[in-house]
């Protein structure tokens, strides 16, 4: 009985402490390298041919009249004709703040902050190489809109080099999607062979202004190769060492809470995933594709995809089989994935994420009910053994070895497993942690309302009502469980403080997580009533 209480106390406090630490770490600003260390790492032999971006606003961007605007049902994008870079991207269906109409801005380039997506052609005859500068494209219009009944929207940019070669860069937008096809069509009308190589990179200010730091969790790079399915590569990593990994396919991305931007070259192409840090304090991560030799009179098409949007696992998986891993559930991903699937399944029927969380809770408690019943039965048997255990303690005194042997014989004789009540507790801990990560990482819960005062299940309860109710429910559960007379007084006091400690812990947890714990406690109270009634009929109290 006492050992079960000890495990419950230690387990709950340990898990809560871990989650509290993680929550605080997520909310705290990420440490960044000093500017001197960043500048020291600028030199890079493997990315020197990839053009750098200005730290401020380029003249072409400042004179916003020159920007090409693209509007679809999901994206509001601005493209700089110099280089054909995406310098602004707003997500139409996702709002900056709940209740406001302003769309969420993911990519932007301002005086103090840069987060853009570049792509171009480098190599010996590259029109975007550092030596030659960036290509200045022309286009037939400066505004493009996806019309009703139109599934795709093409935005063609054209550049004619001095040698007469025509380069066409085409952005293809799709209805209902956040991925953009970026295609190059090269028509070599010159008398000499051409050698080019496509690249795509994402540039972001390492020290973004406060207004740009919209989300509290991980912000930094990530990549995937043949050898590494998924790995985060934060700004400190980039400052210390440049990536230079050859792979077939792969992708490179910048992550932040709920949102991601990623370059995804064709899975069958040989690519190099690279990173660097520029002297202006910009972190760069991207890919360099295969080198293409284009004979005189020949044509060549080179393609890639760019994703800029929410961490939608279905959409990301459709682009690359590993891109959905940017939804990072931690070491319990194998448990979090089915929980997320079940959460989505329930929500598709009830249309309310809070109700879906309640259904998840009922499902978990229902599955664990046989174990919960075994737990309380074991605890009741242990309580009935307390007089006999007290006799053993009096008989053997300080002889721990004989005392232990006698206790084991007594347990065997009475068919009692002293650890039998711990299994439900042990099983609930990973479920709790996995659900924590699901609620923290799943973009679907961003701005998802429940009812009454809970307007966003992904953030803390603004009035702390749920944590207080959760504390009350824990207090009721505690009062329902008899305390063994042999229990140490210090342990009794610690158990009495548990509801208070947990209430304080949960004040800043996502309200969806607190809702799960509160409903779980209510169900547990009902289960206790039912189980105890059955045990009393059997003479077990």
Swiss-Prot record:
- Quaternary structure per UniProt? Interacts with the Sec translocase complex via SecD. Specifically interacts with transmembrane segments of nascent integral membrane proteins during membrane integration.
The record's Gene3D superfamilies line, in alphabetical order, gives: 2.70.98.90
Q: Any idea where this protein resides?
A: Cell inner membrane
Gene Ontology terms for molecular function: membrane insertase activity
Bilayer topology reads: Multi-pass membrane protein
Instruction: State whether keyword Signal applies.
Output: no
Describe the family membership recorded for this protein in Swiss-Prot or TrEMBL: Belongs to the OXA1/ALB3/YidC family. Type 1 subfamily.
Organism, per UniProt? Shewanella sp. (strain W3-18-1)
Q: What is this protein called?
A: Membrane protein insertase YidC
Keywords of the record: Cell inner membrane, Cell membrane, Chaperone, Membrane, Protein transport, Transmembrane, Transmembrane helix, Transport
Q: Where are the transmembrane segments?
A: 6-26, 325-345, 349-369, 420-440, 457-477, 500-520
The cysteines covalently paired via disulfide bonds are: none
**Could you name the domain of life of the organism this protein comes from?**
Bacteria
Functional summary from the UniProt entry: Required for the insertion and/or proper folding and/or complex formation of integral membrane proteins into the membrane. Involved in integration of membrane proteins that insert both dependently and independently of the Sec translocase complex, as well as at least some lipoproteins. Aids folding of multispanning membrane proteins.
